Amino acid sequence: MSRFMIRAVFFRRYTAATVGKPFRNVAEVKQYLAKQTWSIDEILHGEDTGKAAKQGVPTEEEVRKLLALCAFPVEDADLQNSKRILVKQLSFINKLHETSVDDQDKNLDENYARLLPRQNKALTYDDLLKKIDGIKQDEATGEPTGSWDSTGLAKMRKDNYFIVRQGLLKNRK
């Protein structure tokens, strides 16, 4: 029995996971716990949802156009659910835009702050084409294979702008 307990203690000792730097004293723990944090519920269900609703909930026609633009099925779509999801996404984006992180960036150690680099190289048109070629459409999200070619209508390039002269103007008044 005691041999089993020793194995259990030994096993637990070497399987512990750590995240970030360890705390060195109680003051660091108190300082860490005193920092203001966000709750996802506050962000998505707080006052910002009301702001997004005041800014304008997308109409059913706008939701249909967005679904068609994304090549999702429009006929069998749950428009009310899509509207609710759009309002949540808009409120989350608004919250991110309102948050100032400039003061915090000075003290951040990038090794513990982000998984992606902060400064990224600008993409060129050729880089975008390579990335697009590698994208696989997901049938689970309703994307039919080969439904939309994002660069197929761009026939001309001038001053880093891509000119589309056909296809998109069919249903305009």
UniProtKB/Swiss-Prot annotation:
UniProt keywords, alphabetically: ATP-binding, Ligase, Membrane, Mitochondrion, Mitochondrion inner membrane, Nucleotide-binding, Protein biosynthesis, Transit peptide
GO biological process: one example: glutaminyl-tRNAGln biosynthesis via transamidation
Major localization class: mitochondrion
This enzyme's EC code(s): 6.3.5.-
Role this protein plays: Allows the formation of correctly charged Gln-tRNA(Gln) through the transamidation of misacylated Glu-tRNA(Gln) in the mitochondria. The reaction takes place in the presence of glutamine and ATP through an activated gamma-phospho-Glu-tRNA(Gln). Required for proper protein synthesis within the mitochondrion.
HAMAP family: GatF
Subunit structure: Subunit of the heterotrimeric GatFAB amidotransferase (AdT) complex, composed of A, B and F subunits.
The protein's name in its UniProt record: Glutamyl-tRNA(Gln) amidotransferase subunit F, mitochondrial
